Every structure is written in C-alpha cells, then in structure tokens.
Amino acid sequence: MASPAPEEHATQGCPATEEQPPRPGVPGEEAGPEGAGPQVEEAAGRVAAALTWLLGEPVLWLGWRADELLSWKRPLRSLLTFLGANLLFWFLALTPWRVYHLISVMILGRVIMQIIKEMVLSRTRGAQLWRSLTESWEVINSKPDERARLSQCIAESWMNFSMFLQEMSLFKQQSPGKFCLLVCSVCTFFTILGSYIPGVILSYLLLLFAFLCPLFKCNDIGQKIYSKVKSILLKLDFGIGEYINQKKRERSEADKEKSHKDDSELDFSALCPKISLTVAAKELSVSDTDVSEVSWTDNGTFNLSEGYTPQTDTSDDLDRPSEEVFSRDLSDFPSLENGTGTNDEDELSLGLPTELKRKKQQLDSAHRPSKERQSAAGLSLPLKSDQALHLMSNLAGDVITAAMTAAIKDQLEGARQALTQVAPTAGEDTDTEEGDDFELLDQAELDQIESELGLTQDQGAEAQQSKKSSGFLSNLLGGH
C-alpha cells in the first residue's frame, strides 16, 4: 500500500524513523521494569542516527540490506548470503595472495558492477521517474512486523554490554584482587585456546556467530526449539513414568498370581502327598537279606540290580534244603525190600512157606546193587520235581506196607496166643519138632544157595540192615 509521504521526510531522502527526535523517557518507566522497551527504542534510534552521520547514505543502505539478510526475513536470500560468506572466507584463508591484492580486486569488481549498472539504467529514462516516485510516495508495509529489526538487536546487545561493563567496574572497586585474578585467568584461557586452535577457526566461528545469532535471536528459534524439546521431554517423561507404572502393576499381579498358585499347590500337596521314588523302591523290595539298588527305567518299571534274588514259595532255593534234609534222613526209612524182609522170624513163626522167601531173597540180592547206585546218585545229585514225586510215592507205599504188616502181625499174634492156651502139651512138642525140621531144611538150602552165589557178605549186611529197619518200624509204629 502506498500513501503520500510528508514533505520533510521526502526532501531529506531517509526513513522517517531515523530523523524523528528521540522521545524523552518517562522517569517512572526508567525506574521500573516497564521502561525497558522505550529505552531499547531510544538506543536503536541513537545508533541509526550515529551510523547515518558517520557513513552516509550508501553505507546506510548497505546496513539496511544487511539487516534484511541477517534477520532472515527472506530465508532463501539469507541462506545464499551465508553460503557466499563461507566460500569467501575459506578463499581468503587458503589463498596465497596478500591482503592488499584482495582489497584491490574487490574495488575493481565494485567499479565494474557500477559501470554496468550505469549502462543498463540510463539516467535519461528512469532517473526523473524514480526521483518523482521517491519524492511523492512512500512504500508502507501494512503487515505488522513481528520480528525484531537488526537495529533493535544491536541496541539490545549494546545495552547488555554496557551493563556488563558497569558491573565489572563495581566488582573492581569492591574487590580488586579478585578482579585481577579473573582477568588473568581469562587471558590465560584465551592464550591456551589460541595456541591449540588456529586463528582461522576462531574467525570462522565469529562469522558463524554473526549469521546465526540474529537467526536465533530475532526469529525466536531458540524459544521454539526449547518449547518443542520441552514438549518431547514431557511426553518422554510421561511415557517412561507410564511404562514404569505398568511394569510395577504387572509385577504386582504376577506376585499375586504366584502366591495364589503356591497356596493352591500347598493345598493339593496336603491332599495328595508326593511319594519319593527311593522310598517306594525300598518298600517294594522283596529281599530281606540285602537291599537291592533300585533304578527307575524309561518305561516306568523298576530295575533291580546287585542284590539277592527275591525268595518266593515256588523258588528252587526253598526246595533245595528240604530235599537235602529228606535225602539225609532217607536212610532211616525202610525200603520196599526192607519192609518185606524185616519180619523173617514172624513169618517163620507163622508158618509161611520158605520157598517163596528164598526166591524173594534171590531177586533182592540181584537188584540190590542197581538200587544202591540209584540211591547214591539221588543223594549226590539234586532231585528234580518228577524224581521227588516218585520218591514220595515210594515212601508212601512203604509206610502203608509197614502199617498193614504191623496190623497183620498183631492179629496173628493174638490168634497164636489163643491157640497156645487151648492146645495140649503133646501137640506143642510135635509142632516144635516140625518147626525144627523145617528150620533145619531151610538152613541147608540157604547154605547151598550161598555157596552157589557167593553172597555170604551181602547176607550179613542185609541182616544188619533188616535189624535196623525193623527197629525203626517198631519205633515208628509203636503207638499203633
């Protein structure tokens, strides 16, 4: 928007704000904190007036252009200017040329640019038009400028520097020793810094400071960055706190579930107690002599190792001692031959035929060696189940035969006693003679058989065995 400018401003050809007289400060504002704004404006006006008086219009124009570039009102131009300043700085730092050569080159370039400008912009074409516009009109930006101007930044920096100098003077007056120590330490620091860091780097840092400080100061970039970082930190803090609280809640819930599970396991263990495998194996072990080592196999069975074999009722170990005892006492029992030949006197006294007895004795003498060999083998070797059954059946037959013989003997004795009481004495003599005849005849036949077979010694042994067997049967059947 353009509007007619005042005549005094147009005739002088400078901004209106520069020629305005400084407004006198109010005492209340200077004393209070509210007077900081007017003081800055007054300082900015004074700085602008001093620059105008010292440098003139061209330099002042360059200052305003630098203000626009350094305030980053137009970011693209400011960025290009920043890159150009960096290139120029490193060119001056790395080139072997001297300073006056560079200054002459810069002046020559400025002259060439001015000549070109004069050739392009003819005074005859646009000078009058340009002068009329600048005299009658003034360009006014209707948009309020919220950004601080470079002059204001310079004024604020000057005020801060002046306040720092005043404070340092007061500190020097109050404690000169501390002030001297502070100045010496600062000078020593810069000396060490200059010895380690080249001056080129320090100059480049000053250039960066000149470009970036207005950017952060005038555009409030630092405040914006601080607000964003603060919001991020707050979100991060809130997120970390929420995460920690969530972990605490999960841990407390896990502890509660664990305690509840432990209580339930205790209840179950009280109802269903656990049985140890070793205790169960010891209880299941059958042997009473030595505890076997028990191991639990993969298929769920017990494995007995390095122990005695469990004893059962059907085991051969139980049968073996009984067989030994039975075979040891077997010689005391009468055999079939002994049972039939034990009561020779009784048979003779009863009047049995002697011829049958003679034939039986011959058969017994023929079969006795084989039976003795079998009995010796039975005593020396362990008996099998069928042999034991056969032996028991033979023993049962012998016992039955002996019992029947004893019963018949008792009956015959009773009948003989009755006959002896009734019969006369003469009859007894004749019977006695007939018995003697039979005995003499029997003895002669026996001697003949013994001479033929040569069994005199066997007969003596048989007589002794018959006596023993008769004594055993008499003892066994004495109660009948």
From Swiss-Prot:
Keywords: Autophagy, Endoplasmic reticulum, Golgi apparatus, Membrane, Phosphoprotein, Transmembrane, Transmembrane helix. The keyword Phosphoprotein applies. GO terms for biological process: autophagy; collagen catabolic process; endoplasmic reticulum organization; mitophagy; negative regulation of neuron apoptotic process; reticulophagy; sensory perception of pain; white fat cell differentiation. Disruption phenotype: Leads to an expanded endoplasmic reticulum. CDD domains: RETR1_RHD. The chain crosses the membrane at residues 43-64, 76-93, 99-116, 192-212. The keyword Cytoplasm does not apply. Residues 1-10, 317-331, 361-374 have a biased composition (Basic and acidic residues). It comes from the Eukaryota. It is a multi-pass membrane protein. A motif (LIR motif) lies at residues 436-441. One of its GO terms (molecular function) is endoplasmic reticulum-autophagosome adaptor activity. GO terms for cellular component: cis-Golgi network; endoplasmic reticulum; endoplasmic reticulum membrane; nuclear body; nucleolus. The modification Phosphoserine is found at S132, S136. It is found in: Golgi apparatus, cis-Golgi network membrane; Endoplasmic reticulum membrane. Signal peptide: none annotated. Residues 1-42, 94-98, 213-480 are cytoplasmic. Residues 67-216 are annotated as: Reticulon homology domain. The modification Phosphothreonine is found at T134, T340. Residues 302-313, 454-473 have a biased composition (Polar residues). Homooligomer; oligomerization is enhanced following endoplasmic reticulum stress and is mediated by the reticulon homology domain. Interacts with ATG8 family modifier proteins MAP1LC3A, MAP1LC3B, GABARAPL1 and GABARAPL2. Also interacts with ATG8 family modifier protein GABARAP. Endoplasmic reticulum (ER)-anchored autophagy regulator which mediates ER delivery into lysosomes through sequestration into autophagosomes. Promotes membrane remodeling and ER scission via its membrane bending capacity and targets the fragments into autophagosomes via interaction with ATG8 family proteins. Active under basal conditions. Required for collagen quality control in a LIR motif-dependent manner. Required for long-term survival of nociceptive and autonomic ganglion neurons. Belongs to the RETREG family. The LIR motif interacts with ATG8 family proteins and is necessary to target the ER fragments to autophagosomes for lysosomal degradation. The reticulon homology domain provides capacity to bend the membrane and promotes ER scission. It is required for homooligomerization. This domain does not show relevant similarities with reticulon domains, preventing any domain predictions within the protein sequence. This is Reticulophagy regulator 1. It comes from Mus musculus. The gene is Retreg1.
